[in-house]
Design a protein with these regions (language model features):
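Metal-cofactor-binding active-site regions of metalloenzymes
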Residues: 1-908
Length: 908
């Protein structure tokens, strides 16, 4: 690695340690000061908390810290400062780091493209606001500028690679963007918390987080410290942390502006009283109403609403700019940092140390609201991500989020051609109408003078549309009891809810066709584990075929078809399980040419690396493992693979063992015979079912996979133990209960073994109980070869169907690295040039998107940039770059065009 890059990496890691791992209690108690952290304690912190140094000795960490201190001393002349050997000044450390990563160009702070990956890591740990305000403070002082009064910059910094920027200016589209996670919700939440610290709903939700059974495994002090859960037990609850931060903030703001702050009646020694409150949570709680009154007096002195009292402390405000709302916090950070970097200070050293404690408190609170750790798993991510609703419940915050997530990106980035905004549908047509109308109202400005005017909103209208995404739920059915068969099929209540939502969407489209034209697609998101694509099959087929509404006179009016996309293959316990989920989504939901798959990581991850990363051990429900074995056998038999015979034999032996455990041990032969005889009797007058004959059922692997194909049908059709359609039901309802597209031979439904196995899968409680038991499997080479072959077959099947994959680099980087992002295994045209390399790749149309840009502190342009830079850093075995820059840009340009072409608006 280049020495300069190594140095910046060390600065990033040490900054993470000093801003994220130091216990604020030690700072408030005076044991730690921002400008004199001993080198040996910083080294111990590196050794104890940083993955980069987990295999390094304490002496090696001390050498790293000493080298950083010496480099800081070497820069003293440039920065007009005097660094001390053996000690670290955390803000001077930060200034040296940002000076290497950022630059100022035409008055705007940009990220140096060559260091965009370092910047991404820094932002992930401390956020953008601190380093950005530090950069502006440093540069303004360097150029002798007076204190700035404008702080309304974008919350995602741009980079300075002009050739790449020129490529992106040709037009880009974001077709995978969740609305409420695509704005800086922590920043908005923080303002709500800092302005309402006494008996507010936001504080009550902090207490709710404290009550939740969740803790984060990390150290918070220089000497080993405590986890947040341990801090809570010692009185450091999230409520207390927020109140401490709010007290420090209002005190320092008043000091910076020379305003009287009446915290102690007529006394003037506010600092001592503030320190007493910070050291005594009980006393702080007693005074909290008084402190809130001071905040309120600063916030609304003239009765006019202001989201943040700090906005009152500097220059003219431009209320038309939604980024203005963050200016108060930025002014506060900038002003204190500027004071710290100046020779003559307004704040005392103790007060400046309070600012360091404020930052530590803020970051400690942030890790409870935003995923900043490296823990893998969609369940962990969603547990934290859903907390945004705790702090954004008021209408003003929701309107602000809509403007920040949709309006501003479209207004500020003219080459952002299109946004696909994903929202959760309501339970009724009226709820859905109201929700969409409110979102449209927010974009249109609602007639408020500070919001976009009508012409502006009209121009934006054609550049975004909505996709309704259903959310998954686990099956909570009660499987206890002595009866072998139950009356409810799998996910019974959840399927009923889905059907209700589906009919509501139909009714919404029929009653309000003009507004319904703003909705162009449907999707499914959230945890995959425990909720398979089969549960969404009927509602997807129904909505995908819906095409007519009515006008104001009751006449039929054609509507654009609802296109389909589906989050799949993103979260799984077995790579084979993720691949099977992709196959089920395609086949059961009838995804067709032009439809999309969201994430689909299972399609493009290296099976050998994935299983090795799991130490060749997988743990999953027995039913899922049995399904995976049968599906793998089916997939690799469809497409010839050389040398796969041994793998087939292995799968057959696994199937025989687990099929007996899950099914045969829980099926009564006499009962089975009665079901089959009942079917024969009922079918006696049905010509199309003449092949259905009662006989002793001998179940084979072929029967099992055929029964798996029937899972795309509605389970109600198999309630009797065989397939039966109630002809008294209207055709419109029956039409979508049967999956017509998967089966080339519909007579499979009338094979007793197949229909009975599907019936047993849904209604046999003993099978469901046994199948739900977890098994731990040691993965053998034959299994991995099977997965590898099935993955290849599925990749080319997806390509042949004309489906596309929505890639979200930062969202999925915890699964892989940027450089080895699996998108290149789906599409490599432009990166490679030999016929074998090109034909060996399925060349599936892919796109680059943001997913949850507010969660991952990214933008669409930044997503392209991190992928480009990561590919540039790859080296071949000879040490030379694996790809030329022109190859990378050619490949990205092709992806850019494909992303634009994947719009759901093209149906008219």
């Amino acid at each position: 690695m280049d020495e300069k890059f190594e140095t910046i990496e060390e600065l990033c890691v040490l900054s993470d340690a000093l801003f994220c791992k130091v216990n604020p209690v030690q700072v408030l108690g005076g044991q730690v000061f921002f400008d004199s952290i001993p080198a040996h304690e910083a080294a111990a912190l590196l050794s104890n908390t940083q993955k980069r140094y987990q295999n390094s000795s304490l002496l090696e960490c001390e050498n790293v810290v000493d080298s950083i201190i010496h480099r800081m001393c070497d820069r003293d002349a440039l920065r007009m400062r005097t660094s001390k050997l053996g000690q670290i000044h955390v803000f001077e450390l930060l200034s040296d780091l940002i000076d290497a990563i950022l630059l100022q160009q035409n008055g705007e702070v940009l990220c140096r493209y060559t260091h965009i990956l370092h910047w991404r890591n820094l932002v992930q740990s401390v956020g953008e606001e601190l380093p950005m305000t530090a950069m502006y403070a440093v540069k303004d002082l360097e150029w002798g500028q007076p204190p700035r009064e404008r702080f309304a910059w974008d919350y995602v910094v741009r980079q300075n690679n002009e050739p790449l920027n020129q490529l992106l200016r040709r037009g880009i589209s974001d077709h995978h963007m969740h609305l409420w996670a695509s704005a800086p919700y922590f920043q908005v939440s923080w303002l709500n918390l800092m302005n309402g610290i006494a008996n507010s709903p936001y504080l009550r939700n902090c207490a709710r987080i404290d009550r939740e059974d969740w803790s984060l495994e990390r150290d918070w002090s220089l000497d080993g410290g405590q986890s947040p859960a341990q801090a809570a037990r010692r009185g450091g609850s999230l409520v207390s942390l927020c109140q401490q931060a709010a007290l420090i903030r209002v005190y320092l703001c008043a000091r910076l502006k020379g305003l009287p702050l009446r915290l102690v009646g007529d006394k003037t020694d506010n600092l001592r009283f503030v320190m007493d409150l910070l050291h005594n949570p009980e006393l702080l709680q007693m005074e909290i109403d008084h402190i809130q009154a001071e905040i309120s007096s600063l916030r609304d002195p003239d009765g006019e609403f202001c989201m943040d009292y700090a906005l009152r402390f500097f220059g003219p405000r431009d209320n038309r700019d939604p980024y203005q709302v963050f200016s108060g916090e930025r002014w506060f950070l900038y002003s204190v940092l500027r004071d710290i970097f100046m020779t003559y200070h307004v704040l005392s050293r103790n007060e400046q140390n309070l600012f360091y404690a404020y930052l530590l408190l803020q970051i400690q609170i942030r890790v409870r609201m935003v995923q900043t750790d490296s823990k893998v798993g969609l369940d962990h991510f969603q547990k934290i991500q859903r907390r945004k609703w705790y702090f954004l419940g008021d209408p003003r915050s929701q309107e602000l989020i809509m403007r920040l997530a949709v309006c501003e990106p479209l207004r500020r980035v003219p080459h952002l051609l299109e946004l696909e905004v994903r929202v959760i549908p309501g339970d009724t047509a009226e709820q859905l109408r109201r929700n969409i109308a409110q979102l449209e109202h927010a974009v249109g400005g609602g007639g408020r003078p500070e919001l976009p005017d009508g012409n502006d909103a009209e121009n934006l209208l054609g550049r975004y549309y909505y996709v309704l995404h259903f959310t998954r739920e686990a099956d909570r059915a009660e499987l206890s009891g002595f009866s072998r068969y139950g009356f409810e099929y799998r996910h019974y209540k959840f399927r009923k809810k889905l059907a209700k939502k589906g009919y509501a969407i139909q009714l919404f489209r029929e009653r309000w066709p003009s507004l319904a034209r703003r909705v162009r697609g449907i999707d499914v998101c959230s945890l995959e584990i425990g909720c398979r694509p089969e549960h969404f099959a009927c509602v997807f087929r129904m909505l995908g075929a819906h095409s007519f509404g009515t006008d104001e006179f009751g006449a039929p009016r054609p509507l654009p078809r609802l296109r389909k996309t589906y989050h799949v293959g993103e979260d799984f316990l077995d790579l084979a399980d993720g691949l099977r989920a992709v196959s089920e989504a395609v086949n059961f939901l009838n995804l067709d040419c032009g439809d999309r798959l969201g994430h689909a990581l299972a399609l493009c991850m290296d099976p050998w690396e994935w299983y090795q990363g799991k130490n060749r051990q997988i743990s999953l429900p027995m039913q899922d493992y049995l399904d995976n074995v049968a599906w793998l056998h089916y997939m690799i038999r469809r497409r010839p693979f050389p040398g796969i015979e041994q793998a087939l034999s292995f799968l057959e032996s696994q199937f025989e063992y687990y099929f007996r455990r899950v099914y045969l041990n829980n099926i009564n032969e006499a009962e089975t015979e009665r079901f089959v005889q009942s079917g024969e009797s009922r079918y006696s007058e049905r010509e199309f079912a003449r092949n259905y004959k009662a006989h002793r059922c001998l179940f084979t692997m072929e029967d099992y996979i055929r029964a798996w194909m029937l899972r795309g049908d509605h389970p109600e059709l198999y309630r009797s133990g065989y397939f039966w359609m109630d002809e008294s039901l209207p055709d419109e309802r029956l039409r979508f209960q049967v999956n017509e597209k998967l089966l080339a031979d519909t007579s499979i439904r009338y094979i007793p073994e197949c229909s009975f196995l599907n019936f047993s899968y849904h209604y046999n409680l003993q099978i469901r109980r046994t199948g739900a038991e977890y098994v731990t499997i040691t993965v053998k080479d034959e299994y991995i070869r099977s997965v590898e072959a099935a993955q290849t077959a599925l990749q080319f099947d997806i390509a042949d169907r004309g489906l596309s994959v929505e890639s979200n680099p930062t969202s999925n980087v915890k699964i892989s690295s940027y450089a080895e992002h699996p998108i290149t295994r789906l599409y490599n045209n432009g990166l490679v040039h030999t016929p074998d390399e090109l034909r060996g790749c399925p060349q599936i149309p892919v796109s680059i998107n943001t997913d949850d840009s507010g969660v991952f502190f990214t933008s669409l342009e930044s997503e392209y940039a991190v992928i480009a830079r990561s590919l540039e850093t790859l080296r071949g075995t000879d040490g030379q770059p694996r790809y030329y820059r022109w190859e990378i840009y050619d490949w990205l340009d092709r992806i850019r065009k494909m992303g634009n072409d994947q719009s759901f608006q093209f149906d008219g």
